[in-house]
């Protein structure tokens, strides 16, 4: 019978199992990243580490007769120093030169090639510092103390350099994995969709014609471009259309049969369909995207790959949304008309205006149409291009963001009229505190400096708009730069009536005007998303009254219409998502800082 007291120390307590698994996962993830880095960008180099000196204690009589041994403990012929001290100083000097060169390259232009050069210099500096730390300095004396202090400095610099190397590894890992995964997702889509729509003419919808020295147009490539363009118009929630991705592929690849990789998978919204009325707006918006794609090839100081990643991930080119589709929020609509629409329609009236570059913050309760408003303003102004940045985007990663912000700013400077919307801006520009992580502080500083440095030509207006539902957590410096602060309140009674009427339009408005008015009074403190959820739940009321046999045999036109009682029953299920304390906090903030107080 084994003794349990002996086996008990080998068991891991239950409260430490989670920490142990997290530690194990982080270790495996780091090993994977290092292996991927070495396979993609590493070079097989062999560093010669100087051998350790052999130290022997000699007697006084033997030491007096022993000849000096060059390279170990004897004096060097050049400067009269022992070989160990001389080698420590030499490695420190070479490491300093490599690290200085790496910092110069790293802090320069943010292209992928320059980052690879910086990594090479960092590796050489690390090798020199590691070689210098292997040299033992055990004797006594002033020069030996200086050598030991040099080794302490090299040890601290080695740790900082390795941290920066880890950041660069993460940057390359994110970019490479995103490109590889996206390329794998895009391999079979054009071929499958081309078989379904092979009978449709491609000339009518071929709006993306990439240009470049390496582009060779072919019939199959043109058909695939046409098909993906139609798909992008049928899905309005996409952050970037597939046609813009394909036009990028023509300028960056010599094989036209393979499409360019997308930056990230897009969300599909099945509620909105492309109609004939939105077709001219879509073609105008698509022509704007194609025009900006052509300008990328003339960028100087920016890696075209990074510019394409930025435009593919955050450039919005989906179907147009107009102000008539949005109920209420008249103050926000008026402000956007003055800032975006009117300057684009009548630029001669705004020429030379010193307030061409404006920043806004839109405090909104959860469920408001905070992103639909700027998208509608760019749809009304056909010359505007809409950039949408959210906390889900890889561009706002704490490590990658500072690498992309300068390219994003330079990219916007060549576009005609650019509108940047930063969703959940409080997650990026929250108030700076003591003990904050260095990456987060660097990201905030980069954004704030970019805000100050955005200087647009009178013909090229740039507008940065931030949306948040926690405006009280914004940093004071960011709030100062956002000079117009527009509060989007919850829909009032009249707005709720319009929203309910629009939601019931597909069901031929089964409720009377008096019932809609009564329902609008009963849904006080409901947001737009709450009303949408309420209408969806009420639409299930007629189906809930049917049994399983009736559901299988009854025709769709035999199901009864939605009644007012269905909404009353759904009010017990769908409750308001915004509490009174939150609404009071928004009102207090708007009273102090809002532009429409």
Curated annotation (Swiss-Prot):
Biased composition (Low complexity): 232-252
Domain MIT as annotated: residue spans: 91-168
Region (Disordered): 56-80, 193-289
GO annotations of cellular component type: centrosome; cytoplasm; membrane; microtubule; microtubule cytoskeleton; spindle
InterPro entries hit by this protein: AAA_lid_3, ATPase_AAA_core, ATPase_AAA_CS, MIT_dom, MT-severing_AAA_ATPase, P-loop_NTPase, Spast_Vps4_C, Spastin
DNA-binding as UniProt keyword: no
PANTHER family reported for this sequence: AAA DOMAIN-CONTAINING (PTHR23074), SPASTIN (PTHR23074:SF86)
Keyword Nucleus in annotation: no
Positions with biased composition (Polar residues): 214-231
UniProt topology in membrane: Peripheral membrane protein
GO molecular function, one term: ATP hydrolysis activity
Protein name: Spastin
Entry superkingdom: Eukaryota
């Amino acid at each position: 019978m084994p003794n349990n007291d002996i086996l008990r120390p080998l068991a891991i307590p239950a409260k430490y199992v989670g920490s142990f698994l997290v530690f194990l996962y982080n270790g495996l993830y780091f090993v994977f990243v290092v292996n991927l880095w070495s396979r993609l960008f590493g070079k097989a180099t062999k560093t010669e580490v100087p051998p350790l000196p052999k130290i022997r204690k000699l007697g006084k009589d033997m030491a007096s007769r022993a000849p000096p041994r060059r390279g170990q403990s004897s004096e060097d012929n050049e400067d009269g120093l022992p070989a160990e001290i001389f080698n420590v100083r030499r490695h420190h000097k070479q490491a300093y030169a490599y690290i200085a060169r790496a910092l110069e390259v790293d802090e320069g232009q943010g292209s992928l090639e320059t980052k690879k050069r910086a990594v090479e210099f960092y590796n050489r500096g690390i090798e020199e510092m590691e070689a210098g730390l292997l040299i033992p300095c055990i004797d006594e004396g002033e020069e030996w103390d200086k050598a030991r202090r040099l080794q302490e400095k090299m040890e601290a610099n080695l740790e900082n350099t390795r941290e920066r190397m880890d950041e660069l590894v993460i940057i390359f890992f994110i970019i490479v994995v995103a490109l590889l995964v996206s390329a794998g997702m895009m391999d079979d889509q054009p071929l499958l969709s081309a078989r379904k729509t092979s009978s449709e003419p491609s000339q009518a919808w071929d709006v993306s014609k990439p240009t470049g020295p390496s582009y060779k147009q072919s019939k199959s490539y043109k058909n695939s471009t046409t098909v993906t363009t139609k798909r992008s118009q049928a899905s309005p929630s996409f952050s970037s259309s597939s046609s813009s991705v394909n036009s990028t592929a023509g300028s960056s690849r010599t094989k036209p049969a393979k499409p360019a990789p997308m930056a990230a998978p897009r969300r599909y919204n099945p509620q909105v369909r492309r109609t004939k009325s939105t077709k001219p707006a879509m073609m105008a918006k698509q022509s704007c995207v194609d025009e900006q794609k052509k300008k990328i090839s003339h960028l100087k100081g920016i890696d075209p790959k990074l510019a394409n990643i930025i435009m593919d991930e955050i450039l919005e080119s989906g179907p147009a949304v107009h102000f008539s589709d949005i109920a209420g929020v008249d103050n926000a609509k008026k402000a956007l008309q003055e800032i975006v629409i009117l300057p684009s329609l009548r630029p001669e009236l705004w020429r030379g205006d010193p307030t061409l570059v404006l920043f806004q913050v839109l405090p909104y309760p959860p469920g408001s149409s905070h992103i639909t408003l700027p998208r509608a303003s760019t749809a009304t102004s056909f010359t505007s291009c809409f950039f949408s940045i959210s906390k889900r985007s890889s561009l706002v990663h704490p490590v990658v963001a500072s690498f992309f912000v300068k390219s994003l700013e330079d990219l916007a400077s060549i576009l005609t009229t650019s509108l940047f919307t930063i969703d959940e801006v409080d997650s990026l520009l929250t108030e700076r505190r003591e003990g904050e992580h260095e990456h987060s502080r660097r990201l905030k500083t980069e954004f704030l400096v970019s805000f100050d440095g955005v200087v647009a030509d009178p013909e090229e207006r740039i507008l940065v708009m931030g949306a948040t539902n926690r405006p009280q957590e914004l940093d004071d410096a960011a709030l100062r730069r956002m000079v117009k602060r527009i509060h989007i309140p919850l829909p009032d009674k009249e707005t709720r009536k319009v929203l309910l009427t629009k939601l019931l339009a597909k069901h031929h408005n089964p409720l009377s005007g008096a019932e809609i008015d009564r329902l609008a009074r009963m849904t006080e403190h409901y947001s737009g998303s709450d009303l949408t959820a309420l209408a969806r739940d009420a639409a299930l009321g007629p189906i809930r009254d049917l049994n399983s046999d009736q559901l299988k045999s009854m025709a769709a036109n035999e199901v009864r219409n939605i009644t007012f009682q269905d909404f009353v029953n759904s009010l017990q299920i769908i409750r308001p998502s915004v509490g009174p304390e939150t609404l009071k906090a928004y009102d207090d903030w708007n009273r102090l800082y809002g532009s429409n107080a």
